[in-house]
Amino acid sequence: MKPMVLNTNKFQTACFFYMLFFSITIFAQEPADFVNPFIGTSNYGAAFPGPIAPRGMASISPFNVAGVKNTPMEKDSQWLSNPYVNENTFLTGFSQVNLSGVGCPELGVILLMPTTGNVEIDHLKYGSTYSNEVAKAAYYSVNIDKYKVKGEFTASKRVGISRFTFPKGQSNILLNLGLGLTNEEGAMIKVVSSTEIEGMRSVGSFCYNSPEDAYPVYFVAQFSKPADKFGVWKKPAKYNGVEAQWMGYNGKARIMENTIKTVVGDSIGSYFTYKFDKQETVEVKIGISYVSIDNARENLAKEVGNRSFDAIYKETYNEWNEELSKILVEGGTKDDNTIFYTALYHTLIHPNTLNDINGQYPVIKRTKIAKTDDTRYTVFSLWDTYRNVHPLMSLVYPKQQSDMIKSMLTMFDENGWLPKWELNSTETFTMVGDPASIVITDTYMRGIRDYDVNKAYYAMLKGADNVENNPLRPGLKDYIKKGYLTTDNKGPVSTTQEYNISDYSISLMANEFGDKDNVKRFKERSLSYRKLFDKNLNLLRPRTPDGKWYEPFDPNSGANFEENVGFIEGNAWQYNFMVPHDIIGLKKLMGGDQAFSAQLQKIFDTKQFDMANEPDIANPYLFNYVKGEEYKAQEMVKKLVREYFKNEPKGLPGNDDTGTMSAWLVYSMMGIYPISPGDPIYTITAPMFHRVTIKLDPRYYKKDSIVIERQINNGGKINSIELNGKTLNSFFISHDDFVNGTKLKVIQN
């Protein structure tokens, strides 16, 4: 028998491949692992780093925007719409309901705060610096320096779960209902037992509108360990005058120990106190409801029950990973993957779930409680999201988008109008235009039609034609008569443009219904922006009620949210190309391709382009309408992605606007963009990954997936585009062709 001789070369080769496989296996990351919730927590991105489930009602955010130590980014020192700012250093609790990427302060209430030592109820005194923050999908942790307490947080859809690790000695958990981001006041609290608190916090007046529409958010908090002592506090208003002389307690905080009575007021809260002989952990589960305390308790019991913090975290992490895995990317850097999947994560926060686990939810104006077998969604920032978020949902998450349309139609049943900027069954009517019509049309034209389309069409026509007491379209009578709004109205040019886009979408729906008269009527209405086009300036400008040009006119006025006569949140340059349904017509108005391209280029050269402002975010793609200049779109999109979107807290260009900036990034990195909302088309640019696989929902699409592939990685211009091996003759592709294809290949020089 010959002795065994080891082949050293083969052994080394085998070891190399084994170690390579082992390394890949060990370090392989799921899409959810790339999420960095700190992105957008600075530079007014208005994101928060704490945990939330996909489309979750409950969320937890560190609250660090109260107190002079956080100036200038303090909630009462400027217009601040987020509960957390990355640069701030003073923490006063962890809010249990929050909004992500909105432009006005709201929610950010029901603040939980762990402390040690004697009970202190003044947040400016019990607040603390913090360190060692960790944030990832479904999880956030932080060390609270003053008390040497570690806080960990996760969430299910309707329940927030906190885990505090306390040192030996007296420890406290405070529940503060007075402090919050909202400008609304009023709360109720009751200690049910040594392990449970229930209550309500009033919120509302979003963007300082309709304070009479304030509404309650209910909660039930359950603690894993019974408190040794508990109590409730109340800070009353201070009286003046004769009565004040007799009130020895005037304006003084009251602490009611071991009481189980219900306490109401503006600045109230509760505390649980523990005496620990060694390091201990306490878990707090807080169920949320917009219907009742009983529903909050049921949400907690049925959604979480007795399961542990770690079990809930794992479940919510898996939910995130399932949603994010609908798009798989290959060939990018770690930072590319991080900004991409974090952006996709941000698009899956709002709209979010409003109904409780039993299906109940409050209707608009809260006249009654209704029930759904689907999901009742809320937080529709439609002026922002109609441009790209909802088209993205239709492509990747069509069932969610369908339920969003159903939610919008039930809002029409409840309120008589389609939503404009709806928040927790309160219609705020914030911003301008009639964006719901665009979203419904866009969804329908992409083949998602499992809702009452007849009701949808009727609702769209009501909003477009009712000239009396129409909250969706102020100034509609002038618009129909003259074709535009005059300077008697706020933002007349931009509002005219928004009405035009909505009217175009209605003409598309009318065509689907065979309603020829309305096809013609609304198509004509959609082109009326042309009456505001000044050929001497190649710009849109406002007209006065007598039809004359408004003077003095400064096309630069309006940038950076400066008030101006013609436009809402923008200026003439930023709005000049916002006619996505009539770019061909705009080119003719400007004098042809070269004049159009030159005017478009001027926006970028003179730094009028605002990446953080919705009206102009499609501008980089408009070069695709000029034959031979498509390369400018490719260069500009890549430049903007690299300049404004980064793996850092300042990694968004500004307010995320409930996912709109993030959706722009998702599309741009994939190499397609929904250039004309309502029209089911995409324009194409260079993908930033070698390969993108979009998994399609078989309930709505025939194919399992569509692949976008970049053939050459040298950053050159696109030489040709192929769909299933056949060359496309343009930089545009219909939604149907795209989802019924197999591979879209972008070939670069």
Each language-model region and where it sits:
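Terminal leader/tail segments of proteins
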Residues: 699-705, 745-749
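Accessory carbohydrate-recognition regions in carbohydrate-active enzymes
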Residues: 29-390, 394-438, 444-497, 510-531, ...
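Surface-exposed interfaces of beta-sheet-rich extracellular modules
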Residues: 710-725
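Bacterial N-terminal signal peptides that target proteins for export
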Residues: 2-16
